Curated annotation (Swiss-Prot):
Subunit structure as annotated in this protein's UniProt entry: Component of the cytochrome c oxidase (complex IV, CIV), a multisubunit enzyme composed of 14 subunits. The complex is composed of a catalytic core of 3 subunits MT-CO1, MT-CO2 and MT-CO3, encoded in the mitochondrial DNA, and 11 supernumerary subunits COX4I, COX5A, COX5B, COX6A, COX6B, COX6C, COX7A, COX7B, COX7C, COX8 and NDUFA4, which are encoded in the nuclear genome.
Spans within the Mitochondrial matrix topological domain: 46-59
Transmembrane domains' residue ranges: 15-45, 60-87
PTM sites of type Phosphotyrosine: 218
Protein name: Cytochrome c oxidase subunit 2
Family to which this protein belongs: Belongs to the cytochrome c oxidase subunit 2 family.
The reaction(s) this protein catalyses: 4 Fe(II)-[cytochrome c] + O2 + 8 H(+)(in) = 4 Fe(III)-[cytochrome c] + 2 H2O + 4 H(+)(out)
Pfam families documented for this protein: COX2, COX2_TM
Membrane topology: Multi-pass membrane protein
Gene that this sequence comes from: MT-CO2
UniProtKB keywords: Copper, Electron transport, Magnesium, Membrane, Metal-binding, Mitochondrion, Mitochondrion inner membrane, Phosphoprotein, Respiratory chain, Translocase, Transmembrane, Transmembrane helix, Transport
Co-factor binding comment: Binds a dinuclear copper A center per subunit.
Record-listed Mg(2+) binding positions: 198
EC number: 7.1.1.9
Organism: Carlito syrichta
């Protein structure tokens, strides 16, 4: 969950986000080790009493600093490609939801149901109830079942938007005339907040996304009440 003055990532709520957090830690450790080594070498170069330190010519050293970066890049690229393919793979989704971006709200359509669609607008600050989040609450939440694969189809009716929910590791561009897709699977129930992450006009900051992940039985009851 998120909290005020948070500096790190939100807690992972999907297998993809857990993989992304592990990859971030893996890459950050490599960057930290490289930075420490470079700073150590610079310090030695500045403090050594030896002369002609800038005219060294050693074939072995040049070979090492050519091969070593290639190995490091491979160690970063392989897990990155694995996650990339995992994010692109969608196997037998239980539910498909079509999302359309507008200036400046989202509309949703549950394509597996005959007449289940709605628009989702931000709740103005003056209408917020105690405990609700400013600029993040909507009048119609996207209710989805947890622990099942869900396919999101994302597009736009006017300008570029981006449908992003950080705790689920989701960020997909909404492009006019193009239908993008992504998959989500939540491992726990709750409310998950996101926002449009592509500058789309004067009210870009007022396009929140709220997903309400519930057990399958509650989702079925909700879908019946909405149709």
């Amino acid at each position: 969950m998120t909290h005020p003055l948070q500096l790190g990532f939100q807690d992972a709520t999907s297998p993809i986000m857990e993989e992304l957090l592990h990859f971030h830690d893996h890459t950050l450790m490599i960057v930290f080790l490289i930075s420490s080594l470079v700073l150590y070498i610079i310090t030695l170069m500045l403090t050594t009493k030896l002369t002609h330190t800038s005219t060294m010519d050693a074939q072995e050293v040049e070979t090492v600093w050519t091969i070593l970066p290639a190995i490091i890049l491979i160690l970063i690229a392989l897990p990155s490609l694995r996650i990339l393919y995992m994010m692109d793979e969608i196997n037998n989704p239980l539910l498909t939801v079509k999302t359309m971006g507008h200036q400046w709200y989202w509309s949703y359509e549950y394509t597996d149901y005959e007449d289940l669609n709605f628009d989702s607008y931000m709740v103005p600050t003056t209408d917020l109830k105690p405990g609700e989040l400013r600029l993040l609450e909507v009048d119609n939440r996207v209710v989805l079942p947890m622990e099942v694969p869900i396919r999101m189809l994302i597009s736009s009716e006017d300008v570029l938007h981006s449908w992003a929910v950080p705790s689920l590791g989701l960020k997909t561009d909404a492009i006019p005339g193009r239908l993008n897709q992504t998959t989500l699977t939540s491992t726990r129930p709750g409310l998950y907040y996101g926002q449009c992450s592509e500058i789309c006009g004067s009210n870009h900051s007022f396009m929140p996304i709220v997903l309400e992940l519930v057990p399958l039985k509650y989702f079925e009851d909700w879908s019946v009440s909405m149709t």
